[in-house]
Amino acid sequence: MSDEKNKFTDASFENCDLKNPSDRDALKQAADKFLKAHAAEADADVKGGGEALVDPLAALQDENKELKDQLLRLAADMENLRRRTARDVADAKAYSIANFARDMLSVSDNLNRALDAIPEGAKENDAGLKTLAEGVEMTERAMIAALERHGVQKIHPEGQKFDPHFHQAMFEIPNSDVPDNTVQQVVQAGYIIGERVLRPAIVGVAKGGAKDISVESDSD
């Protein structure tokens, strides 16, 4: 208890005369001091309790915000991982046979070279050779058809503008009738798988024509 409260409850006030102005003033002053002292104590208690409530709440709010940020970052990372995984799986499906297909194209080239090596007219004079050549042609077509079923497509660059992404120029052909760099001859067929070049077409391009005419590239 404060001194003011003790004074207010002191027995000396029990015998005060309320009719006496000095006693009334003394009693009033003691009561004012008592009320002020208790009001100050109550205010201090309220402030102390408020601080105890505000600090933990602010800490919880900060912790909640930090956890929410971590959760959002984790969700973004998981979404990026999901997309990357889906893309890798799609690429694996589309391009898993790329090396095998490239090797099979070399076999196809050899079959075509074997057919080209047969002298013109020899098949008409030799039934056995004709049958063999037809068998080789059928085998080569079946091989290419099988590759096409797995996404391998032949490039048809004849008459199109040279595109270094799909074509490999080996020589130039003088020709003023078509724009410069127009593909004039295909030495070796090119192929794509999906959106990737499996093998560029080896071509000869025109030289001596107009230089400012754009010819649309077609790698179908």
Swiss-Prot record:
InterPro entries: GrpE, GrpE_coiled_coil, GrpE_head. One of its GO terms (biological process) is protein folding. One of its GO terms (cellular component) is cytoplasm. It is found in: Cytoplasm. Keywords: Chaperone, Cytoplasm, Stress response. Pfam families: GrpE. It comes from the Bacteria. GO terms for molecular function: adenyl-nucleotide exchange factor activity; protein homodimerization activity; protein-folding chaperone binding; unfolded protein binding. Its main location: cytoplasm. Residues 1-22 are annotated as: Disordered. Belongs to the GrpE family. Participates actively in the response to hyperosmotic and heat shock by preventing the aggregation of stress-denatured proteins, in association with DnaK and GrpE. It is the nucleotide exchange factor for DnaK and may function as a thermosensor. Unfolded proteins bind initially to DnaJ; upon interaction with the DnaJ-bound protein, DnaK hydrolyzes its bound ATP, resulting in the formation of a stable complex. GrpE releases ADP from DnaK; ATP binding to DnaK triggers the release of the substrate protein, thus completing the reaction cycle. NCBIfam families: PRK14140.1 (NF010738), PRK14141.1 (NF010739), PRK14150.1 (NF010748). PANTHER family: GRPE PROTEIN (PTHR21237), GRPE PROTEIN HOMOLOG, MITOCHONDRIAL (PTHR21237:SF23). Homodimer. This is Protein GrpE. The gene is grpE.
